[in-house]
A protein has these predicted regions:
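Short glycine/proline- and aromatic-enriched beta-strand/turn motifs that initiate or cap beta-hairpins
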Residues: 20-80, 242, 248-250
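Residues that define the transmembrane beta-barrel architecture of outer-membrane proteins
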Residues: 33-37, 77-81, 135-141, 155, ...
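Gram-negative (and chloroplast) outer-membrane scaffold detector with strong preference
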Residues: 22, 26-36, 43-47, 86-171, ...
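Flexible, solvent-exposed loop segments that connect beta-strands
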Residues: 51-74, 107-136, 169-179, 215-235
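Short conserved catalytic/interaction loops centered on acidic-Pro-aromatic/His motifs
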Residues: 155-156, 170-177, 199-202
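Conserved C-terminal beta-signal and adjacent last beta-strands/turns
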Residues: 182, 187-195, 200
Length: 250
């Protein structure tokens, strides 16, 4: 047992020693530039967090008042992709300010659960589900502050925080629901700079949460098919969430 423990300790010490060895630095002065530019590509997962309205009353095409109870859910994180450009400005040794205009493309898959009382069997409740694909195309411009650790060899970890205003370019009046055109995301993330011979590669993982209620309540005015009203009125709030993995080439 002692030999095993000693072997493990020696292996850890050797690994740490190797990791601490200095190597030739690629692009040693790249972080001293007052500003630089680059491109970005990535993927993301997006979700909608709904606050459902509960039972509602609406007027159908015959002028009669009808009660309904429909809930909305995006029951999975839907993938998308991101492309954009960036400009980064050096504030100090450890702080940078980044502006990153980009476009986020994706499709959300929504499920509507219509809970109805069966007229043929007293007291029984049945559920009817409907689906909707909600395509999204966001144009955005993120404003981020980056705090970087000291560079060691050819890598430099960092954390970041910022805000990301977005504008939704998609929307279809025939959909059950629509999202508002604008949203503002809070961003928190971490990443690492890898200094390659000809450019700097920066993989970054960030978590994004929409600060605004993007559920478009005015969409009900555009609904001509009254049978859609139970689904259009089903929610009162919606907040967007994303997890983004982005690769910056600088």
């Amino acid at each position: 047992m002692r030999r095993i423990i000693l072997s493990i300790m020696m292996g850890l010490i050797a690994t740490i020693a190797i990791a601490q060895e200095r190597t030739v630095e690629n692009r040693p002065y790249t972080d001293l530039r007052p500003c630089h530019f680059g491109v970005m590509v990535g993927t993301h997962l997006q979700d909608l967090e709904f606050i459902n309205a509960g039972p509602v009353t609406y007027t159908d095409e015959n002028g009669a008042e009808v009660n309904s109870n429909v809930t909305i859910d995006q029951d999975r994180w839907d993938p998308g992709f991101t492309v954009g450009v960036l400009g980064e400005f050096r504030l100090s040794t450890h702080f940078q300010f980044r502006i990153a205009p980009a476009m986020y493309f994706g499709t959300r898959h929504l499920t509507f659960h219509n809970i109805m009382q069966d007229a043929n069997e007293d007291g029984n409740v049945k559920q009817e589900d409907k689906k909707q694909e909600l395509k999204t195309a966001y144009i955005s411009s993120a404003f981020d502050i980056i705090f970087s650790a000291p560079r060691f060899n050819n890598h430099r970890p960092y954390i970041m925080a910022g805000i990301n205003p977005m504008m939704n370019l998609s929307g279809n009046k025939s959909d059950y629901i629509q999202l508002k055109k604008t949203d503002i995301f809070l961003e928190l993330g971490l990443g690492c700079d890898f200094y390659l011979p000809f450019f700097k590669l920066r993989p970054e993982l960030k978590f994004m949460y929409g600060l605004m209620n993007i559920y478009d309540k005015d969409h009900v005015k555009n609904v001509k098919d009254k049978s859609m009203l139970p689904y259009t009125l089903a929610a009162k709030e919606a907040h967007s969430k994303m997890i983004a993995l982005t690769f910056y080439f600088e």
